[in-house]
Amino acid sequence: MLTDGSQHTYQNGETKNSKEHERKCDESAHLQDNSQTTHKKKEKKNSKEKHGIKHSESEHLQDDISQRVTGKGRRRNSKGTPKKLRFNRPRILEDGKKPRNPATTRLRTISNKRRKKDIDSEDEVIPELATPTKESFPKRRKNEKIKRSVARTLNFKQEIVLSCLEFDKICGPIFPRGKKRTTTRRRYDFLCFLLPMPVWKKQSRRSKRRKNMVRWARIASSSKLLEETLPLIVSHPTINGQADASLHIDDTLVRHVVSKQTKKSANNVIEHLNRQITYQKDHGLSSLADVPLHIEDTLIKSASSVLSERPIKKTKDIAKLIKDMGRLKINKKVTTMIKADKKLVTAKVNLDPETIKEWDVLMVNDSPSRSYDDKETEAKWKKEREIFQTRIDLFINRMHRLQGNRKFKQWKGSVVDSVVGVFLTQNTTDYLSSNAFMSVAAKFPVDAREGLSYYIEEPQDAKSSECIILSDESISKVEDHENTAKRKNEKTGIIEDEIVDWNNLRRMYTKEGSRPEMHMDSVNWSDVRLSGQNVLETTIKKRGQFRILSERILKFLNDEVNQNGNIDLEWLRNAPSHLVKRYLLEIEGIGLKSAECVRLLGLKHHAFPVDTNVGRIAVRLGLVPLEPLPNGVQMHQLFEYPSMDSIQKYLWPRLCKLPQETLYELHYQMITFGKVFCTKTIPNCNACPMKSECKYFASAYVSSKVLLESPEEKMHEPNTFMNAHSQDVAVDMTSNINLVEECVSSGCSDQAICYKPLVEFPSSPRAEIPESTDIEDVPFMNLYQSYASVPKIDFDLDALKKSVEDALVISGRMSSSDEEISKALVIPTPENACIPIKPPRKMKYYNRLRTEHVVYVLPDNHELLHDFERRKLDDPSPYLLAIWQPGETSSSFVPPKKKCSSDGSKLCKIKNCSYCWTIREQNSNIFRGTILIPCRTAMRGAFPLNGTYFQTNEVFADHETSLNPIVFRRELCKGLEKRALYCGSTVTSIFKLLDTRRIELCFWTGFLCLRAFDRKQRDPKELVRRLHTPPDERGPKFMSDDDI
């Protein structure tokens, strides 16, 4: 140990008598006990005298420290046996108290085990100062051996490093490698997990375990302080090079574990250091590291903090940093920072002042007939409207050939049905919205026995009036009322009257007498209003946004009752169109698009609503001009389309002169076209009949690498079909799909997509329809056309070349050589005018979006339809029969297979064994089947918005026969016509990436099925797995026990 600048060593061969050694140990122990007793007795009388005695005792015991540390001078207890010493860390004293002499403190061992000391080696012993509080160690177990703690010996030439381990469970100085540190054995009391324990006990135990980290953090801060202030006192005579040899500070100390620093000047730092040096001289310590620390030492500001601080960064740097960080986003799942998606470009409609002026005039008068002051302006609008009419006629003509006839056909329903219907159509698909309305109609049915009292009941004001029939006088009053003050609607910017007496207008336009049957309500809206919001929310919960929609619907119904006394809006059919528009816009939750839907589809007004499908199609077909896209974005790269209101502002001034029937068919065809072909993502451009006039297709065609390929190169592989489902199905029970559709040939498809075959079951000879038919079958027979009568769609190559040239100009490729452009524009056949479609990872996924079946067409007088409602004469679809395969169950989504080893002599009882059930059905001469109901017949011809939710060839699967099939004789299927049935979740998923011919045949000769229908409860159901299983619900884990 270092004492007064000298080093104590033991020479080789020097020995001592054991008795003399024990005597000295007893004397030192006795002297220390006496010193402590004298210290306690004289503490109150004379502090100076106490300090002198203490100082003399420390000098006397200084020489014996090394002996006690090495274990040669152990203290003995009353029995004479050596007593184990306790060693503690340095004490941290409070302000105003003097530290204890380090020579009188008891030392603490650092190493784990006692090591034999070599006599020839030179060792240095590092004493450690006592802590102010006693540490309580856990009690040892009876069978546990007592471990001895000895002093840690270090080679003098090794470097002493004082540092702290941040957030370590065992904190302390970093010792040289190869030496182990002592660790306190932790005992975990598992009773604390069962019994409640006070918080203060837990905190006290943790504080005892981690007390060393706080001490050594302060020692590290003091060492850092010495390192920074040594240049200020380098000339001090008591600090020599020999004493500084052991003072090596680690530069990598952690600073943020040090307690908060106070603001002091550099003079206070030097003055405090001088006090420490004086203490070192008075007590004869070897270095400043041996001086005990005070609490105030940790609060002194270091010398580095006295120096001038760095200037604060400028605001621009901070703003730049914020901007850079703003481009990053945190992924909560991965907890990593990734680049944010690029900001999507939103297109804007190029609205000229003349269009905006014409729009404002039409919103005020709502009449297309007006006179222009300038003949040139009138001629300009007339020319533009003629051009638009030509393009609209072309679109309707092609869509009629592909998607069938969609002209206006009246459905039953009231105005209230349509208003609630547009509430349910907002921000969702037609499938979910139609299901929601069907659920409401099933929950609150109309009681036909109570009759027309609810519908015919007139308000008291109307009964007391002398006449409620429209006359010239009443109409003139309305015209005078319309010339009052105007105001601007915040929703649409329409100039409107400030005050309108709706009660007076309602009495004026309400017709006398009963309401016709076509305008009856489909739902008992009075019961809906009285049921409460919770009941309505539960009814439409599957639709989504049920809380907001239920609140709006009930508010609308309550407002009608509060204002008019009943729920009746049939007077809007007779009111002027501009007043109807204003009345609808004043309903909370009804916007311009919803109001136009009610007017066009429910009231047959002259209007044209623009929804997401219509707006996207109008932009892609070039009906609406756009402002130049920034950053070189092409049309096919556009994701965010202009707002629907801006598109309607451009379209309506040019469509206002078209007839109402044309506007209805145009809207209906556009809605279906947007679901089948022109979808938002992955549109089916290669099968689209409008690709020759499409700006989107031309842009994608120019940007693709296929542009400069030779015509001989094939873009897509021909369509291929697989064989039958399974070898277990007999060959005579299956037939090729070409008996049902003419799309089997490999050259009919432009895309490389594999389709599963349609299984025709059972196989029966095709019989001709008898010539003599009943009068009931006449409309049924006229509905269906032969395959040869399906119209063929023309392809305009000249229009496509013109679109490609325009796309080349926009993309900037016209600067290329004329040879390259001529090669690009060589399109000999429509089949080569295709764009590459990135194939999906799993081609089977698109195949599983639809399930194809072969069904039989049932006449209206068929024996199997006795328990079903009579088909509506104006329903374009018939009843259908889907046959079950032998061994098939309602939950089967894979073809049945043979499950037993029977040879036919003895049949098994397994439900899904195709072999045994085929023999049973053949021996019994029976079939099992499911009935499919036409949608118009299932809804009894009543649905809001004139039934535009459904497709013209849509059918519902009977839920009862889907679970428990009907069993009938095989003779009942003879002579029935076979058709194709496409089942799926939505119309978009069914037609995903189908070729043009198959889509055309599906609309003209096939049928669609999206849902099942419960005839008793009259509410929609999901299709059973046998008819269709979504891709996400396929696999072994979804199979039932019968299918395994």
Curated annotation (Swiss-Prot):
GO molecular function: 4 iron, 4 sulfur cluster binding; DNA binding; DNA demethylase activity; DNA N-glycosylase activity; metal ion binding
Pfam families: Perm-CXXC, RRM_DME
Enzyme Commission code(s) on record: 3.2.2.-
Top EC class for this record: hydrolase
Cofactor note: Binds 1 [4Fe-4S] cluster. The cluster does not appear to play a role in catalysis, but is probably involved in the proper positioning of the enzyme along the DNA strand.
Region: Disordered, residue numbers: 1-107, 1024-1044
Additional remark text: Although strongly related to DNA glycosylase proteins, it differs from these proteins. The DNA repair function may not exist.
PANTHER family the UniProt entry points to: DEMETER-LIKE PROTEIN 2-RELATED, TRANSCRIPTIONAL ACTIVATOR DEMETER
Function according to Swiss-Prot or TrEMBL: Potential transcriptional activator that may act by nicking the target promoter. Catalyzes the release of 5-methylcytosine (5-meC) from DNA by a glycosylase/lyase mechanism.
Designated name of the protein: DEMETER-like protein 3
